[in-house]
């Protein structure tokens, strides 16, 4: 099995592009197997929750982070788990 890594994705997104476009910065922590999957997850989450098109999301930085650098409590708690029983 591949090891799940934690990535920090930083960028900008243009919200409400049709009426009054506003550009906002974002920083998200994502659990993924590689950078490509992390980017795809960001596009999916921002697009699905905020109705943003992919071409309005601009990713500026993506890097793998260690557990002690994570500020998102949910991701930090998930990183500490050894296994999940469903």
UniProtKB/Swiss-Prot annotation:
Gene: rpl18a
Matches recorded under Pfam families: Ribosomal_L18A
Gene Ontology biological process terms in this record: translation
Family classification: Belongs to the eukaryotic ribosomal protein eL20 family.
Self-association state and partner proteins as the record states: Part of the 50S ribosomal subunit. Binds 23S rRNA.
Keywords noted in UniProt: Ribonucleoprotein, Ribosomal protein, RNA-binding, rRNA-binding
Keyword rRNA-binding belongs to the record: yes
Top-level taxon of origin: Archaea
Gene Ontology annotations for the cellular component aspect, listed alphabetically: ribonucleoprotein complex; ribosome
GO molecular function: large ribosomal subunit rRNA binding; structural constituent of ribosome
Protein's name in the database: Large ribosomal subunit protein eL20
Species this protein is from: Sulfolobus acidocaldarius (strain ATCC 33909 / DSM 639 / JCM 8929 / NBRC 15157 / NCIMB 11770)
């Amino acid at each position: 099995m591949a090891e799940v890594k934690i990535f920090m994705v930083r960028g900008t997104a243009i919200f409400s592009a049709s009426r009054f476009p506003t550009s906002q910065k974002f920083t998200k922590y994502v659990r993924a197997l590689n950078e490509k999957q992390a980017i795809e997850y960001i596009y999916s989450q921002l697009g699905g929750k905020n109705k943003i098109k992919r071409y309005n999301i601009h990713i500026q930085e993506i890097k793998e982070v260690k557990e002690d650098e994570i500020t998102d409590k949910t991701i930090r708690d998930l990183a500490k788990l050894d296994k999940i029983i469903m």
